[in-house]
């Protein structure tokens, strides 16, 4: 007879078909990332991409994990792969810009944020990130205007978060 824990673990075991699904490995990577297991998340995203190399969210999310580990060249490569598949992918554009900004490449970062905003003018996170890049470039008035737009898009909550 199974204990409740053994029974639960059997129910949670993925089927063979799930194990062959890129979507399964993407979700596994997301779960691992959300639980702070970055290295394991990267492995899961790699597995997903081995099954389906066109899975944009796996490229983007892997890039985010790599950026959080300060592995910036690898992160940029992931965002580039996502953008090869969908050049106007707003999250990949903004995330690429954030990595460039972390490397103090503010002019390049600004171009990414502008492209993300061109893809979705209501993307508050890109406006916020653009404001930071503009400020770093010494363009204070433009930075204030971008920040005001970000705050307006966030619904007047008074604070914006990177997205």
What are these regions (language model features)?
Residues 2-22, 132, 136-163:
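Terminal, low-structured helical/coil segments at or just beyond the last alpha-helical repeat
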Residues 22-23, 56-57, 90-91, 124-125, ...:
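Helix-start (N-cap) detector for alpha-helical repeat units in TPR-like alpha-solenoids
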Residues 18-51, 57, 68:
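Alpha-helical segment of the N-proximal tetratricopeptide repeat
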Residues 5, 34-47, 68-81, 88, ...:
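Structural signature of tandem alpha-helical TPR/SEL1-like repeats
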């Amino acid at each position: 007879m199974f204990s409740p824990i053994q029974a639960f673990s059997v129910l949670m075991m993925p089927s063979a078909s799930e194990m062959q699904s890129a979507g399964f490995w993407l979700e596994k990577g997301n779960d691992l990332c959300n639980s702070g297991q970055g290295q394991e998340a990267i492995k899961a995203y790699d597995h997903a991409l081995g099954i389906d190399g066109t899975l944009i969210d796996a490229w983007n999310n892997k890039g985010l994990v790599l950026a959080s580990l300060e592995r910036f060249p690898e992160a940029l490569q992931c965002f580039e792969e996502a953008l090869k598949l969908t050049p106007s992918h707003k999250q990949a554009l903004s995330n690429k810009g954030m990595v460039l900004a972390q490397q103090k490449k503010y002019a390049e970062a600004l171009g990414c944020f502008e492209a993300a905003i061109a893809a979705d003018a209501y993307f508050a996170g890109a406006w916020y990130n653009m404001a930071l890049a503009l400020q770093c470039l010494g363009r204070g008035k433009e930075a204030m205007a971008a920040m005001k737009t970000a705050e307006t898009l966030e619904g007047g909550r008074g604070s914006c978060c990177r997205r």
